[in-house]
């Protein structure tokens, strides 16, 4: 199948999933064309049958905000016409599904099919803004196929966008179990922490919804009882606020800001605990990646996280903002080697339910169904 993929190429869940899916599809013999404004973040090496098409957005004084969605529509049209795309997989409803529909209209209705994957904030945040709600709803409903990364996100879409539930196929995110495992890389502990220190990790785009400050507050309480170091991976608008809080709490010397990292698997494989204190998560891909590396996860009980993290089995769940509870759960594991080993093994075992070998064929099957209609 010739597949176009339109996505945000940046550091974030939807872009990561789109890129990893494209790589897996290419491995399985499909021809994949990424259509976006920059090379996808995790597409850092040559992969046979993968092509990248840059969306160019000319700057004109007339436009205070250059219309990327229009340039994307034309780029999709050009790639579809030149390479004979069978389908366009839009990751994130706006503007990708919108631009795909425009491209399809320009080519005439009998061309590629559109499959839109809903990832989270396109439904729970951006799409519910009055400025974008109508176009988000239109774009989803005009798609030939719709997938959501969790049952939670499917329910939200049905409730807020009047989409028939039978039109939405839930296909969860997946993880490469060969790359994400505890023994996949040489141990970097000595480069990241002092001997005897436990390594606690958080990875995000440092936006307010991720509540990175809660991760620092949890760590501050844990570090009073257990020698430990907090690794903060990623970057974003909240970083300076997080740095100031670490200084205010007196833990800045034990908090390492690593910025954006292309290969988080190496960091997760030597971590002892992963913190995900988000206010909202449609799935929690990074929690799954941590679990695959045998790292117990302490997360908030929101959105699709309970579909991945089972409280008391492969991690712990707590209410949003309950930093004391999260700290207590962290200490329970970090002070009891047997409890940690049991939860680490359970985390890896449960992550296997979300292997690429299990999930990617679900997309292939859905592609076939959609093309056959």
Regions picked out by a protein language model, each given a short descriptive name:
Residues 180-194:
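A short helix/loop element that forms part of the nucleotide-sugar donor recognition site in Leloir-type
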Residues 260, 279:
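Aromatic "clamp/platform" in nucleotide-sugar-dependent glycosyltransferases that forms part
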Residues 325, 332, 339-353, 362-365:
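A short, well-ordered alpha-helix in the C-terminal region of glycosyltransferases
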Residues 7-11, 23-68:
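N-terminal strand-loop element at the rim of the active site
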Residues 296-299, 309:
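Short hydrophobic beta-strand element within catalytic cores of glycosyltransferases
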Residues 193-219:
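Conserved donor-binding/catalytic core segment of Leloir-type glycosyltransferases
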């Amino acid at each position: 199948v010739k597949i176009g993929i339109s996505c945000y190429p940046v550091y974030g869940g939807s872009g990561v999933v789109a890129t990893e899916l494209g790589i897996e599809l290419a491995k399985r013999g499909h021809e994949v064309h990424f259509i976006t404004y920059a090379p996808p973040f995790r597409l850092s090496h040559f992969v046979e049958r993968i092509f990248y098409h840059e969306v160019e957005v000319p700057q004109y004084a007339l436009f205070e905000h250059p219309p990327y969605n229009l340039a994307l529509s034309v780029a999709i049209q050009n790639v579809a016409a030149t390479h004979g795309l069978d389908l366009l997989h839009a990751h994130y409803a706006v503007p990708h599904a919108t631009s795909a529909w425009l491209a399809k209209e320009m080519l005439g209705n009998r061309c590629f099919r559109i499959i839109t994957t809903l990832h989270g904030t396109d439904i729970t945040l951006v799409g519910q803004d009055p400025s974008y709600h109508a176009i988000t709803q239109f774009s989803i409903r005009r798609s030939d196929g719709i997938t959501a990364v969790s049952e939670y996100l499917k329910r939200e879409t049905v409730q807020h966008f009047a989409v028939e539930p039978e039109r939405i196929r839930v296909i969860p995110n997946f993880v490469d179990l060969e790359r994400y495992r505890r023994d996949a890389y040489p141990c970097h502990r000595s480069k990241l922490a002092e001997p005897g220190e436990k390594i606690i990790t958080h990875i995000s785009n440092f936006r307010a919804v991720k509540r990175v400050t809660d991760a620092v507050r949890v760590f501050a309480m844990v570090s009073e009882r257990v020698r430990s170091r907090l690794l903060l991976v990623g970057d974003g608008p909240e970083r300076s606020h997080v740095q100031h809080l670490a200084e205010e709490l007196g833990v800045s010397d034990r908090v390492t800001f690593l910025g954006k990292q292309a290969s988080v698997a190496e960091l997760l494989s030597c971590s002892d605990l992963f913190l995900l204190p988000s206010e909202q998560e449609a799935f929690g891909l990074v929690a799954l990646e941590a679990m695959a590396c045998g790292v117990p996860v302490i997360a908030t009980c929101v959105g699709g996280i309970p579909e991945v993290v089972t409280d008391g089995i492969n991690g712990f769940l707590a209410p949003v903002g309950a930093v004391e509870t999260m700290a207590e759960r962290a200490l329970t594991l970090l002070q009891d080697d047997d409890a940690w080993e049991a939860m680490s093994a359970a985390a890896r075992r449960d992550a296997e339910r979300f292997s690429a070998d299990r999930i990617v064929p679900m997309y292939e099957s859905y592609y076939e169904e959609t093309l056959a209609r």
